Amino acid sequence: MIVNFKTQRVIQNFSKFLLSLNAITDSGLSILNMTEVDENFDSRFSCNSREYEYWILNTKYPRPTWKNRTFWYQHRIDVPRLEAELELLKGEHDFRSLAKVASLKGRSTVRTILDVKLERSLELEGLLKVKIRANGFLHNMIRILTGTLLEISNGKRKDTNVLEILSSKDRTIAGITLPPYGLYFIRAYYDSYPKIDFMYSHLDFLK
């Protein structure tokens, strides 16, 4: 995750400063890289799109070493159907039915899905990654979306599709909210600040 801050003095040595910061951070936090940007940059509002992944471990038995890192799902998944549903999501849609109702409070629920696909892990059999990039997300949107897609692709909702659920604009029509573990923030995109891209070049640990 990218954050920005201002300093009263010029940082002469980024590498040394990075080591110093990591020496005082909590054990659950690590700062991996840093660079200088102009004063107009804002890590939140300068962002054009964000990318997330939701990991599903589709195996008959759970894997203890993956507990709380993926959502274990032992039921059959119709993968071609799941991939077809993901394709339907591309473009601009109203995601009111896939958001936590209490979080809306008059906010726009229209978002644009720029890219979405299913990736099968080569390292772990049964591990599926729903990869989604959009210009913005609603509260719990990805977790509700993935839960809904699982219900469609396992046959529970075989006679409907995700577009029909979106058009209903009714949260009660959609599926369950999957747990937060399994959801990973991958990166933010800053089209006006291409120099930031290099900060993600070494982040291949989720591939």
Swiss-Prot record:
This is tRNA pseudouridine synthase A. The keyword tRNA processing applies. SUPFAM superfamilies: Pseudouridine synthase. Coiled coil: none annotated. Keywords: Isomerase, tRNA processing. Belongs to the tRNA pseudouridine synthase TruA family. Formation of pseudouridine at positions 38, 39 and 40 in the anticodon stem and loop of transfer RNAs. It catalyses: uridine(38/39/40) in tRNA = pseudouridine(38/39/40) in tRNA. One of its GO terms (molecular function) is RNA binding. It comes from the Bacteria. Homodimer. One of its GO terms (biological process) is tRNA pseudouridine synthesis. Its EC number is 5.4.99.12. The active site is at D26 (nucleophile). It is an enzyme of class 5 (isomerase). Substrate binds at Y52. PANTHER family: PSEUDOURIDYLATE SYNTHASE, TRNA PSEUDOURIDINE SYNTHASE-LIKE 1. The lineage of its organism: Bacteria, Pseudomonadati, Spirochaetota, Spirochaetia, Leptospirales.
